[in-house]
């Protein structure tokens, strides 16, 4: 079955999360933001694992670079936006701002935190930062480079010439999913 045919089913978690967030008056409450972040993470993880099963870690690189932004865009509706930021940048589009860096430092200092709140600005009413921690499968592309397949190293170097997102260990803070409520 093609991804195109499964797309409506794959987006159901987003619809449920958005409905939950929309039911909150004024600003997104913490549980709703966590639900939206979890839906995004589940959808991305499902595509990554399918890509890994179909063609190994080299195949997964394309999912992170091309599909992850699209999945985030699909989740960003009705005044809410979802994006990823990294503690070490691979994709320059995921470079954390100064406010993002402060939230990442707070998440690093609180390893058991489910999320941290960030301040808004002229465009964003509120931010929730949900930690992304390194899992075993993540180590294929984000672990030590001396253990990576040469084809994977080449794929990463081609797609991300300034890659800094390696050298992580299991459980490390990789970054965060940022859920923003817009004015």
Which residues make up each language-model segment?
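Short Cys/His-rich local motifs and their 1-3 flanking residues in nucleic-acid-associated proteins
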Residues: 143
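Short, cysteine/histidine-rich loop/knuckle motifs that typically chelate Zn2+
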Residues: 140
């Amino acid at each position: 079955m093609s991804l195109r045919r499964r797309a409506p089913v794959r987006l159901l978690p987003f619809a449920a999360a958005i409905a939950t967030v929309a039911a909150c008056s004024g600003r997104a409450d913490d549980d709703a933001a966590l639900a939206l972040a979890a839906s995004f993470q589940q959808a991305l993880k499902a595509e990554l694992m399918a890509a890994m099963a179909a063609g190994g870690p080299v195949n997964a690189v394309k999912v992170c670079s091309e599909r992850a932004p699209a999945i985030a865009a699909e989740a960003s509706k009705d005044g809410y936006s979802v994006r990823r930021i990294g503690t070490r940048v691979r994709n320059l589009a995921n470079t954390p701002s100064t406010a993002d860096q402060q939230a990442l430092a707070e998440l690093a200092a609180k390893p058991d935190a489910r999320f941290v709140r960030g301040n808004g600005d002229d465009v964003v009413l509120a931010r929730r930062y949900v930690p992304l921690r390194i899992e075993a499968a993540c180590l294929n592309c984000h672990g030590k480079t001396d253990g990576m397949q040469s084809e994977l190293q080449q794929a990463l170097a081609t797609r991300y010439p300034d890659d800094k997102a390696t050298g992580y260990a299991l459980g490390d803070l990789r970054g965060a999913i940022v859920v923003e409520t817009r004015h």
